Curated annotation (Swiss-Prot):
Main location (coarse class): membrane
Record flagged with keyword Disulfide bond: no
Protein name, UniProt field: Outer membrane protein assembly factor BamC
Top-rank taxon, per record: Bacteria
Gene3D superfamilies (UniProt xref): 3.30.530.50, Outer membrane protein assembly factor BamC
Family: Belongs to the BamC family.
Signal peptide segment: 1-16
S-diacylglycerol cysteine lipid modification positions: C17
Gene that this polypeptide is encoded by: bamC
Length: 373
């Protein structure tokens, strides 16, 4: 069938591209494979042998090398490597398996769910169908992935097309502690055809390795973009201020009973409130001496050497005297609320008057939006 050609083309043109097989081979001839090794010179008795240069000596092959890989059989392409491009990824040598180690970058995100979602979204972005998947086993098996390349094109006839069809299996394995895992990949089906005719190709181990590494690197590159977006979004969330209210305690109504303790109520989950206090406390002139997130405890010292209190309280007497204190965090009535208590060094609640006096300056710093770095 005659193809439609622009009128500007006055002569027929035929273009030829190198085939995938030819790209593996060195340019030029391979007559060197037929060259025979010449015997050494025979030196007559009584004469000295000439000095031979060893500059161009070819080293002997080791026991694992294949001495048949010469000429057209020698693959000249540089080896591919697994590239840990995404945040929290690195490569561990593990024999012949193709995998990349992935560490969690957000303790609030389930690592296995993140990896599984990233792989599915990557395949969808490339219009690659999923044939089967098993979340419990961490397996994702793709449908046939088809790639076509025009090898010979002529304006007067049909194109000669090289087609590559493959199927892959991804395996997500996360360790029981949930902080790290890995993504492994296997090439499970491979077909090649040229001009509609099936080619009987027996892939070498190196060929399989190249294909799987290339696919894995593409998936990791996609993960890199998504993780960068997630990190930026988290920084934005953490930069936003946290509203804080003071809950005033009531004096004891019965002699001998303890008064209700005043505290601050943060409108944020425990972890976010904890992280914000690491920024706010030093700004208030509270030196963080130690901390224990499991117990929700900050051990702090108050020093009157920053000028903060005098500027904040308009030269009034400091609401908190110099010394050692403890700040205790507890979850509120709901997960998105956190109670903050201020105790002395003996873990006794401070007077309600002191807690309420500090509230104004404390809440201003907690509510302040921060710039993203």
């Amino acid at each position: 069938m005659l193809k439609q050609v622009t009128p500007l083309v006055l002569i027929a043109a035929v273009t030829a591209c190198s085939s995938p097989v030819e790209r593996r081979q060195a340019n030029g001839g391979d007559e060197y494979t037929n060259v025979k090794v010449q015997p050494a010179l025979t030196i007559p008795e009584g004469l000295n042998a000439p000095t031979y240069s060893k500059e161009f000596d070819i080293p002997k092959l080791n026991s694992k090398a294949d001495d048949k890989l010469v000429g057209k059989l020698l693959d000249i392409r540089p080896p591919l490597q697994v590239l840990p491009m995404a945040e929290g990824t690195h490569v561990e040598e593990s024999g012949d398996s193709i995998k990349i180690v992935v560490e969690s970058i957000d303790k609030d995100v389930d690592l296995k769910q993140e990896l599984y979602t990233v792989l599915n979204n990557y395949l969808a972005s490339q219009s690659i169908n999923v044939l089967s998947e098993d979340y419990d086993k961490g397996l994702i098996e793709t449908d046939w992935i088809e790639n076509e390349e025009v090898i010979d094109s002529s304006f007067w006839g049909s194109d000669e097309i090289y087609q590559l069809r493959q199927r892959y299996q991804f395996e997500v394995d996360v360790r029981p502690h949930g902080r790290s895992g890995n993504i492994a990949i296997n090439l499970i089906d491979h077909e090649e055809s040229f001009d509609g005719k099936q080619q009987n190709i027996l892939l070498s181990g190196e060929d399989k390795r190249r294909y799987t590494i290339d696919m894995l690197n593409n998936a990791v590159a996609y993960m890199s973009v998504k993780r960068s977006q997630a990190i930026k979004a988290k920084r934005l969330r953490e930069s936003l201020g946290i509203d804080v209210n003071v809950v005033k305690g009531a004096p004891a109504t019965v002699e001998g009973e303890a008064a209700e303790q005043s505290y601050w109520l943060a409108d944020a989950p425990f972890e976010r409130t904890w992280d914000r206090l690491r920024i706010v406390l030093p700004e208030m002139g509270f030196e963080i001496v130690d901390m224990d997130s499991n117990k929700g405890l900050y051990y702090i010292n108050v020093n009157d050497d920053s000028g903060f209190w005098s500027s904040l309280w308009s030269e009034k007497k400091l609401p908190v005297e110099e010394g050692s204190y403890r700040m205790l965090l507890k979850e509120g009535d709901s997960e998105d609320k956190t109670r903050i208590y201020l105790h002395n060094s003996e873990d006794k609640p401070l007077d309600n008057v002191v807690v309420e006096a500090v509230y104004e300056g404390f809440s201003e710093l907690m509510q302040e939006d921060r710039k993203i770095r």
